[in-house]
Amino acid sequence: MAKGAVKKEKFEYEFFGPIGALGVTVLTTVVSFGSFYICNEEGCPAKFSKISHIFKKTPLFDQKSLILYLLWFSTLTLLWKCTNGKWAKGTPIDDKGTRLLYKINGFNSACLILGVVCTSIYLLGASCMEFIWDNFLQLMFAAYVFSVVLCTFCYVQSFFGKQQLAKGGTSGNILFDWFIGRSLNPRIGNFDIKCFCELRPGLILWVVFDIAFACHQYLVLGGRITDSMVLVIIFHTWYVLDSLINESAVLTTMDITTDGFGYMLSFGDLVWVPFLYSLQARYLAFHPVDLGLVKTLAILCLQFLGYYIFRGANGQKNRFRSNPNDPKLKHLKFIQTKRGTKLLTSGWWGMARHINYFGDWIMAWAWCLPAGFGSPIPYFYVAYFGVLLVHRNARDDHKCRVKYGEDWEKYCKAVKYRIIPYVY
């Protein structure tokens, strides 16, 4: 009892504890479904009378949509099992240095799925993708229900057998632990649920949605797609495929190494990413924008700049963490912590503690600008993402301050800026 009391006393809540967890759960649900009601063919933003009409006439549940989503998740699981891929070791998850194995074959799955989608469009025509347009809300509801069931399953599973628990999900409060995630690595055999959801069902579905919306625009415009839609699809597909090509890099991120798999990640991976991140493509499907050559080239340059920073920084960090003794990295300066970890203070990571976030945010602007300035709603992503990155930086900073102590203070003096060099 005494030991239990000490643990409870030392526990520090994130997101303002259970009340914050409930608030985020409700808010993200409202925003996700609200994005459909408020931004559609009736207007973006639509008038209240139109929103009310859509709300009344459009059912949330559709059996075909639920079956299709379950088939989608099952197909990707089967592809994970059946397609070739190397096995990579994750970072140590305990003091004994235990490292879990992860199958890296997400890129193969994406290529197969997108190949089937494109072949179907070529053979059957753009109209074969209209089910997604006509049942987008119902598909969102199916994904939402599935994400809640999945994170609840992982929460219950965490109480049975030998489980590595996430430190942040052991408060003892059911709501908070369910939200933040109690199990660090929920698995069925060697199938890691968290790592699988991180990069596959949501990310690949995001691209499928973009393609479906481009098909709808093609049908509406009588056989053409705007340059703005082409840009959005290229940027999103590029981001997704690049993430899957570099799938092993996710094994060193906070989502995998630190966070449990609760509602926050389950909902984020399966609902928020595909249904909210495809907002620009959905908007352009009913509000086409023709950019012209100059604007197209300017947005392309912005995307390339963001990607150069994002991928360069992440690649450098991943190589250094995987093999800090690599001769190619000997020019990099670092602080040796008392815990044995090395903190980079030069290269990309000498510019800002999260320079990769800056690159990510620049790309977010490139994804939103093709929508033009007819509505502020397509820019929701860049605003939300900026807030997310600032919050994630603060969260990471707090954890590192606790973890490294005075070494972190020394590191912050060496690398003064958080995200944007010379600004923030």
Curated annotation (Swiss-Prot):
One of its GO terms (molecular function) is Delta14-sterol reductase activity. GO terms for biological process: ergosterol biosynthetic process. It is an enzyme of class 1 (oxidoreductase). The chain crosses the membrane at residues 19-39, 112-132, 370-390. Pathway: Steroid biosynthesis; zymosterol biosynthesis; zymosterol from lanosterol: step 2/6; Steroid metabolism; ergosterol biosynthesis. It is found in: Endoplasmic reticulum membrane. It catalyses: 4,4-dimethyl-5alpha-cholesta-8,24-dien-3beta-ol + NADP(+) = 4,4-dimethyl-5alpha-cholesta-8,14,24-trien-3beta-ol + NADPH + H(+). Signal peptide: none annotated. Keywords: Endoplasmic reticulum, Lipid biosynthesis, Lipid metabolism, Membrane, NADP, Oxidoreductase, Steroid biosynthesis, Steroid metabolism, Sterol biosynthesis, Sterol metabolism, Transmembrane, Transmembrane helix. Belongs to the ERG4/ERG24 family. Delta(14)-sterol reductase; part of the third module of ergosterol biosynthesis pathway that includes by the late steps of the pathway. Erg24 reduces the C14=C15 double bond of 4,4-dimethyl-cholesta-8,14,24-trienol to produce 4,4-dimethyl-cholesta-8,24-dienol. The third module or late pathway involves the ergosterol synthesis itself through consecutive reactions that mainly occur in the endoplasmic reticulum (ER) membrane. Firstly, the squalene synthase erg9 catalyzes the condensation of 2 farnesyl pyrophosphate moieties to form squalene, which is the precursor of all steroids. This is Delta(14)-sterol reductase erg24.
